[in-house]
């Protein structure tokens, strides 16, 4: 089945949804995989542009609001840690945790940033 992700803020339906992240569209190429809702839904990009991705559904399902999108085949121009992640990391270290699990690691700098913020108070696990 065909499915579109785009920047159009209109409510989604069975044929398309809004993905409000132009940086993802800018980095996509045909053949890239998109994993939605922790990989429960899988899409393959057939065609794309600066504001859309036309995809083939390889594993279907229902997409509800604010589900995560992972692009495992593409290095995205995004920081590994959001402002909230940095705050949460500091709080976790203050609690005395032993390990921090860093998701969606794309570059060595992502781990370096987390390690610098942890300042030796916790080990980093890349996943």
Feature-to-residue mapping (PLM):
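Non-catalytic helical/linker scaffolds that mediate oligomerization, partner binding
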Residues: 1-127
